[in-house]
Amino acid sequence: METVRLSAAVLALCGAVMYAQATLSFDVAIVKPAQPGGRGGIIRQMPGNQRYVANNVPLRLIMTVAYSVTDRQISGGPSWVDSEPFDIDAKAANPRTSDELHVMLQHLIEERFQLKIRHDTKELPVYELVVDKGGPRLPVHDPADLDHPPMGGSPGGMKGTNVTMNYFAFTLSRILDRSVIDKTALPARYDVSLEFAREGLGMKQGVADPSAAEGPSIFTALKEQLGLKLAPAKGPVDFLVIEHAEKPPDNQD
């Protein structure tokens, strides 16, 4: 009898989580083609934890943010997914966590672009982000401050505020040649500041920057500055295959 009760409780909890995710949506959202020659090329979570804005961004790049994957983990779909930019201005009724906003962004593009994707998991070379033998050197973020600004690149590294280790690992994946999996078991949110040489990494640099060659490698920087380490390993990597996508009508809100 106790087993039956426990199973029922687990099923009820799973159902509640799935329902909560299914009902996460922005209160107001505008999705439209970007103006020809428009400037921007950026998608970001706005201060206040209620709003996502994209300016002049193709669907493929929007997907990397919504699903927390790198560009190399997305395949398929029509050619315009890579080449035609869109503007998005989406606002939630109340402040949300970053994870919830990402789910809301997923639901938005799945609805507006009639997006259908298939997940494909492959066992590939990865880096595991682990705590180095000397222990972590990461400032814990003030739990009373709920703002989640996105991590940003700087001329000689990157900075992030209120960052989980899982999201930090994803950010590292975007600039390295393989996916990074969080194995730190560090549960808090942290303020991260990392200085390293960008030269030879996958960070976009429109104009040659002499500072890109300055500083330690990212592997050395992680050890010396944060007490973390990238350990080569093999692990599961999630790939998204676009099976269907349609352009949204103009001025859809």
Outline where the language-model segments fall.
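Beta-strand-rich assembly/attachment modules of structural machines
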Residues: 2-253
